[in-house]
Amino acid sequence: MEIKQKKVWLSLIVLYAITTSVLGDFGEPLLKGFYKESCPLAEEIVKHNIEVAVLKDPRMAASLLRLQFHDCFVLGCDASVLLDTHGDMLSEKQATPNLNSLRGFEVIDYIKYLLEEACPLTVSCSDILALAARDSVFLRGGPWWEVLLGRRDSLKASFAGANQFIPAPNSSLDSLIINFKQQGLNIQDLIALSGAHTIGKARCVSFKQRIVQPNMEQTFYVDEFRRHSTFRRVLGSQCKDSSRDNELSPLDIKTPAYFDNHYFINLLEGRGLLISDNVLVSEDHEGEIFQKVWEYAVNQDLFFIDFVESMLKMGNINVLTGIEGEIRENCRFVNI
């Protein structure tokens, strides 16, 4: 696995070379090695504590990756997702896509505590999220990439935005495409970032609609997933009734502990767990998405390269830089 990761890393050198800096909304750049002088051990502190957290709870890797996704899709990559409800401001944590679903806040809290001890008011919570996502992917066998740093933290959260912009597990393909386009992301980004579902788990409430047999008289196409009756029965036994809505099943049934390309192999076999996974193939009437899914299924290196490119794009959505926002002392609250 280490050899494979090194091979992909070498394939990404050209990509890194052209992304050593990215401008924020007001012209201040995100940079490689942003904390080299102000907090030289920042990236090492994050890396070490992500390693500890994932060793203790392997599922935490997917949870931390998901945290950055849910942050960037609401207001931008500004750590607004980490803010608790305070006064008149409702936390994004309470929004429907996040409630009883997002995890890993305590890991970010502890890393922030250590960074404040080492370098007070220097490393932003939004940069911690970006580094944590990268390190989590790498720890599960995925690619490594240079995270450009220098983000600052927002002064507000958007409960309404979290309900509006975070894709639902039962999203149609059209709604996913529109949702990603609103963030400046294209169809290739949608496919590549969906590959993050190669790790992690989902609750029964998120996918039990996929288990119920359709009324074939009202169905214009056969959901490939439903042809796998054994797969369906196994999942159905976990989600018999509403009392089991919080039971968990791996998003990738084949290699749930590894960040690899099996998610795309599963899609081609009709074994995507969520509706929003399956529609990448079942609702792609033109075949463009199916072709890319097939390419990723047979070429893991290509998936890794495109995934990194899309993560870099996502990590730069509406970032705050320069004098915008602040560096929070505590990721859960704006500074007083």
From Swiss-Prot:
BP terms from Gene Ontology: hydrogen peroxide catabolic process; response to oxidative stress
InterPro entries named among the record's database cross-references: Haem_peroxidase, Haem_peroxidase_sf, Peroxidase_pln, Peroxidases_AS, Peroxidases_heam-ligand_BS, Secretory_peroxidase
Pfam families, per database record: peroxidase
Keywords for this protein: Calcium, Disulfide bond, Glycoprotein, Heme, Hydrogen peroxide, Iron, Metal-binding, Oxidoreductase, Peroxidase, Secreted, Signal
Induction (free text): Late induced by benzothiadiazol, a chemical analog of salicylic acid. Enhanced expression following incompatible bacterial pathogen attack.
Active site, per annotation: 70
Cystine crosslinks: 39-119, 72-77, 125-331, 204-239
Chain positions recorded as Ca(2+) 2 binding sites: 198, 252, 255, 260
Gene Ontology CC terms: extracellular region
Compartment(s) where it occurs, according to its Swiss-Prot or TrEMBL record: Secreted
Sugar-bearing residue positions: 170
Membrane-spanning segments: none
Needed co-factor(s): heme b; Ca(2+)
EC numbers, comma separated: 1.11.1.7
PROSITE patterns for the chain: PEROXIDASE_1, PEROXIDASE_2, PEROXIDASE_4
Family that this chain belongs to: Belongs to the peroxidase family. Classical plant (class III) peroxidase subfamily.
PANTHER family the UniProt entry points to: PEROXIDASE 20 (PTHR31388:SF152), PEROXIDASE 72-RELATED (PTHR31388)
Protein name: Peroxidase 20
Gene name for this UniProt entry: PER20
